[in-house]
Amino acid sequence: EQGYPVRALTRSTEKVQRLFDNRVEAVVGDIRQPETLPPAMTGVGYLICATGTTAFPSQRWEIELPEGSGGLAGVIGWGRILTDATYRQQHSRNNPHIVDALGVANLVAAAPADLKRFVFISSVGIQRQKQFPFSALNAFGVLEAKQQGEQAIQQSGLPYTIIRPGRLIDGPYTSYDLNTLIQAKTQGKRGVAIGQGDTLAGDASRIDVAAACVACLQNPAAENQIFELVNQGSRPAELDWNRLFASLN
């Protein structure tokens, strides 16, 4: 809608076609495999990183227990996944550390040197990892991993914007969580609040987060900024992103 040609880095072209109905160019790659990234970076001026995995062990972690780990052995294996951090890292290929820390660092390293903006979707709670409920969310290190991803971006020398949304709601419903099951929506009734210092909490519409990503691409007030985004208050007829970004320090 804003006139940007879009290239989607994906492990599944079918998924991209299903979500975007062939309106974007799909390039196969995997941030966990840095050798797959350079072909996707040719001619890229702006990069939006919206990758992630589940905060808690799930099928999306691609857990691989030792061969023959059925029955009681499987139960023991899952017990170790839940309680032994080293074992967990060794036997899961898509956990937060691999995706949100190492994967983001791989993407940073592959980004063109003349990139105009690197936008990263992180999470509220990065600076509140020891406070409930973020301590529970971070039980398996997702906030630590996202923080490491943020640091890789900040230390890269690339111009960046880091957005820390609240709990994501609205479609597309691709996550395996309670919100997906109930398909919660803002239904356009709540406004957008942004803040700094990791003080905000609440829900954030995926639609509004996506709009913020696009709005900040060429906005100088959002360059090299980190901010939280949640939905709260009454919603104006039209969101004024210039006004919102102007409040950033």
Regions found by a protein language model. Give the residues of each.
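Oxidoreductase cofactor-interface core, primarily capturing Rossmann-like NAD(P)-dependent enzymes
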Residues: 1-5, 11-16, 21, 26, ...
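NAD(P)H-binding glycine-rich loop region in Rossmannoid oxidoreductase-like domains
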Residues: 8-112
